[in-house]
């Protein structure tokens, strides 16, 4: 496979939401359908027997929340998928903001009972600043939910973006039977025996709208309600425009339940069909765009994470490749340091787990061992013509605190520890001179 073919099969996106909308659970189910895991976990708090793959830190397992962004990669239907699972809680939003700089599109998860919430609005605004496509997954349809038409109106009024329902829910709560795919014009009815607490793939039955068999499968009432609602949608909604989606002006909307897997695979298939290949980035030195398929390698560092492996007390720099190909042991020019460095080892990331990679392509996110030479926003490149990507912006702190060491004899270690956490971007240090 040529470099261009490898690059064009990459899909790199972030998943954003307000806390507890089901973002990490959806991530797990995408991994399940992608074959990266055999049994999905979910975020349910301390009592959950199986924790989410992307929530690898002890505090995440204990509290049942995501506190740091995770990178996960799998292959599905010929596409190489890179998922950036981000924290939803505003306490950790700085990490989320930076991670969005590495994404080519975003999936916005919304709770069907609550609609658009505060943190969703903040993260949506960051996405719009980058003009990246935003796809919407309305989650928790297996619970009591607001009317689907009302949810669409809620998104458009609060976020100011047009919506287009790619599928339509059949019932909600205990009566959530499946979805109608507006592209194929097929009804996908989910089998209740496929639930198995959502840890396995769900079974689907496909049928034509209006098929008498749907009366038995859905109940006559839900079948007729679906026919009426689809007729209303087809008459009222504007035509689907992929160009508007790619410009971030129109959000395709999908309905489903991540917990029970209902609607997850149809979403994944349609999302990968519509979401863009790696986007061109702007060289801040010239103002020109850098073609992802060009031969010369370029990349930037968007995150630094220490102690992912407790046994080695390591420090990993997360690198988004913007063009060309990474090869193990290659040399690249470190723009901020003004010198060539050897990229001895790259690692493929699956949350906390890692594997050595010999090569990676534009769109991929890999980890580099960092002995202290990298900072967030650094650019790496090869070729005679140097490029530099814009630095990653800092955002206003969410909380303020005064920190003092208890043991004055350990001030050196205290200062070093604070500096390391600041270098990771987890905190901003304001000191009196």
Enumerate the predicted regions with their spans.
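Structural and coupling elements of P-loop NTPases
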Residues: 1-433
């Amino acid at each position: 496979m040529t470099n261009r073919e490898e690059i064009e099969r990459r899909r790199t996106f972030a998943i954003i939401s307000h806390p507890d909308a089901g973002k990490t659970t959806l991530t797990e189910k995408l991994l399940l359908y992608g074959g990266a895991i055999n049994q999905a976990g979910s975020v349910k708090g301390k009592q959950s027997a199986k924790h989410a793959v992307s929530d690898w830190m002890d505090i995440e397992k204990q509290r049942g929340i995501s506190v740091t962004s995770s990178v996960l990669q799998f292959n599905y239907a010929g596409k190489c998928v890179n998922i950036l699972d981000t924290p939803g809680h505003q306490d950790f939003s700085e990490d989320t903001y930076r991670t969005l700089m590495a994404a080519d599109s975003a999936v916005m998860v919304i709770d069907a009972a609550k609609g658009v919430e505060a943190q969703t609005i903040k993260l949506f605004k960051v996405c719009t600043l980058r003009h990246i496509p935003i796809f919407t997954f309305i989650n928790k349809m297996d619970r009591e939910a607001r009317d689907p038409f009302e949810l669409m109106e809620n998104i458009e009024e609060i976020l100011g973006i047009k919506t287009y329902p790619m599928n339509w829910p059949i019932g909600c709560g205990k009566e959530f039977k499946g979805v109608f795919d507006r592209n194929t014009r097929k009804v996908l009815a989910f089998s209740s025996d496929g639930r198995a607490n959502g840890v396995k793939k769900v079974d689907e039955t496909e049928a034509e709208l209006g098929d008498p068999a749907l009366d038995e499968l859905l109940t006559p009432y839900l079948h007729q309600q679906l026919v009426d609602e689809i007729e209303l949608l087809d008459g009222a909604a504007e035509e689907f425009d992929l160009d508007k989606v790619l410009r971030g002006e129109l959000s395709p909307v999908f309905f489903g339940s991540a917990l029970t897997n209902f609607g997850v695979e149809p979403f994944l298939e349609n999302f990968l069909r519509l979401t863009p290949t790696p986007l061109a980035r702007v060289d801040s030195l010239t103002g020109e765009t850098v073609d992802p398929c060009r031969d010369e390698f370029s990349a930037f560092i968007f995150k630094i994470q220490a102690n992912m492996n407790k046994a080695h007390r390591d420090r990993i720099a997360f690198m988004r490749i913007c063009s060309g190909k990474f090869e193990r042991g290659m040399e690249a020019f470190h723009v901020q340091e003004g010198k060539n460095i050897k990229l001895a080892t790259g690692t493929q990331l699956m949350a906390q787990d890692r594997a050595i990679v010999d090569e990676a392509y534009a769109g991929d996110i890999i980890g580099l061992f960092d002995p202290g030479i990298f900072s967030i926003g650094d650019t790496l490149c090869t070729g005679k013509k140097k490029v530099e990507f814009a630095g990653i912006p800092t955002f206003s702190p969410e909380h303020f605190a005064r920190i003092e060491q208890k043991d004055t004899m350990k001030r050196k270690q205290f200062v070093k520890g604070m500096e390391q956490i600041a270098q990771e971007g987890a905190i901003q240090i304001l000191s009196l001179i």
